[in-house]
Amino acid sequence: MFKEYKIYKFFEQVKQETYKVVWPTRKELVASTLVVVVAVFIFSPICLVLDYSIHNIMQLLLNIGK
């Protein structure tokens, strides 16, 4: 019985806390989303080039002894 009460109380507190959350406006949400999308498009090619370069360097080093 006590365990069920604790679970119930926990979810009641969670519900109360959701009312205190300051949710972003639509404008803020769109702006944040655009920042993330632009960052992904900027950093993806950089990661691709770095990965390809490291791969080629490792292949070169591993094939030296052959």
Curated annotation (Swiss-Prot):
It is a single-pass membrane protein. InterPro entries: SecE_bac, SecE_sf, Translocase_SecE/Sec61-g. GO terms for molecular function: protein transmembrane transporter activity. Keywords: Cell inner membrane, Cell membrane, Membrane, Protein transport, Translocation, Transmembrane, Transmembrane helix, Transport. It is found in: Cell inner membrane. Its main location: membrane. The keyword Protein transport applies. It comes from the Bacteria. The chain crosses the membrane at residues 29-49. The keyword Transport applies. GO terms for cellular component: plasma membrane. GO terms for biological process: intracellular protein transmembrane transport; protein secretion; protein targeting; protein transport by the Sec complex. Essential subunit of the Sec protein translocation channel SecYEG. Clamps together the 2 halves of SecY. May contact the channel plug during translocation. Component of the Sec protein translocase complex. Heterotrimer consisting of SecY, SecE and SecG subunits. The heterotrimers can form oligomers, although 1 heterotrimer is thought to be able to translocate proteins. Interacts with the ribosome. Interacts with SecDF, and other proteins may be involved. Interacts with SecA. HAMAP family: SecE. Belongs to the SecE/SEC61-gamma family. This is Protein translocase subunit SecE. It comes from Rickettsia montanensis. The lineage of its organism: Bacteria, Pseudomonadati, Pseudomonadota, Alphaproteobacteria, Rickettsiales.
